[in-house]
C-alpha cells in the first residue's frame, strides 16, 4: 500500500483499550495538529444498532479463527482523500493499520444478509472537525454502580465540550435526525465511500 499516511505507525497513536471513542477523538486531534489540510477529509464512524449488539470480525478482542466479537458499539477513523483511496484506521482490528475501505468493510462487517435483523449494523459518520467540537464524555459509562472502573481510563482528563458534560449516547444512537453527522445502513455506508471499478468504468463512458 503506497499512500502518504496520516499516522505512519500505530505506535504513534494514543490508545486505551475499551475507550475507542476517545482513541478516535485523539486521532482527529492529531490530524488537526499535524496535517490540518487533511481534516476536512477525515471522519469518526460509530457503528451500533438499536439493541447495541453488533458483530464485528477481525477484532483483537475477538474469539476463534475469525476473531469475532459482539460490541455494544465501536468507533473507527476514516480518511477519504480521493475516490477509492479511502483508508480505515481502526486501533482494535487485527487487519493492517491502515486498511483500504473495501477490504476493511468486507472482512470486518461481512454482510447483513446472514445476520438476524437485531444484529444489523448501522453507521453514524461524523466529520472530524465536528467530532472534535461536539464530542463530550465524562466516562460514566465505564463505571460500576459502586464507582469503580470497568476498565482503567486514559491518563489524560476526560474530553469535555463547552456545551455538554456527557453526550456519548447521542453518537451511539442510530436514529436518523438525532445526533451529529449522518446515519447509514451497511449498504448505504459502502455506497458513500466506495465505488467498484466496474461502476467507475460505466460512469466514465
Curated annotation (Swiss-Prot):
Q: Name one GO molecular function term.
A: protein-N-terminal glutamine amidohydrolase activity
Active-site residues per Swiss-Prot or TrEMBL entry: 20, 74, 90
Q: Source organism's superkingdom? A: Eukaryota
After gene disruption, what is the outcome? Defects in long term memory after olfactory learning.
* GO terms under cellular component: cytosol; nucleus
Q: What class of enzyme is it?
A: hydrolase
What InterPro entries does the database record attribute to this sequence? N_Gln_amidohydro_ab_roll_sf, NTAQ1, Prot_N_Gln_amidohydro_ab_roll
Its job: Mediates the side-chain deamidation of N-terminal glutamine residues to glutamate, an important step in N-end rule pathway of protein degradation. Conversion of the resulting N-terminal glutamine to glutamate renders the protein susceptible to arginylation, polyubiquitination and degradation as specified by the N-end rule. Does not act on substrates with internal or C-terminal glutamine and does not act on non-glutamine residues in any position.
Q: How does it assemble?
A: Monomer.
Q: What is this protein called?
A: Protein N-terminal glutamine amidohydrolase
Species source reads: Drosophila melanogaster (Fruit fly)
UniProt gene name: tun
Amino acid at each position: 500500500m503506497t499512500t502518504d499516511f496520516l499516522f505512519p505507525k500505530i505506535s504513534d497513536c494514543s490508545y486505551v483499550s475499551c475507550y475507542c471513542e476517545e482513541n478516535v477523538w485523539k486521532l482527529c486531534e492529531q490530524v488537526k495538529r499535524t496535517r490540518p489540510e487533511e481534516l476536512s477529509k477525515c471522519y469518526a464512524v460509530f457503528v451500533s444498532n438499536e439493541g447495541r449488539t453488533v458483530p464485528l470480525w477481525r477484532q483483537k478482542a475477538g474469539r476463534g479463527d475469525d476473531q469475532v466479537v459482539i460490541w455494544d458499539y465501536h468507533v473507527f477513523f476514516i480518511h477519504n482523500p480521493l475516490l477509492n483511496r479511502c483508508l480505515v484506521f481502526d486501533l482494535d482490528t487485527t487487519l493492517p493499520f491502515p486498511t483500504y475501505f473495501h477490504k476493511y468493510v468486507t472482512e470486518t462487517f461481512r454482510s447483513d444478509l446472514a445476520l438476524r435483523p437485531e444484529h444489523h449494523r448501522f453507521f453514524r459518520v461524523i466529520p472530524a472537525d465536528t467530532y472534535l467540537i461536539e464530542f463530550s464524555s465524562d466516562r460514566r459509562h465505564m463505571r460500576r454502580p459502586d464507582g469503580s472502573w470497568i476498565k482503567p481510563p486514559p491518563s489524560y482528563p476526560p474530553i469535555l465540550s463547552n456545551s455538554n458534560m456527557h453526550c456519548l449516547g447521542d453518537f451511539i444512537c442510530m436514529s436518523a435526525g438525532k445526533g451529529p453527522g449522518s446515519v447509514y445502513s451497511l449498504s448505504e455506508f459502502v455506497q458513500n465511500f466506495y465505488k467498484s471499478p466496474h461502476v467507475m468504468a460505466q460512469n466514465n463512458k
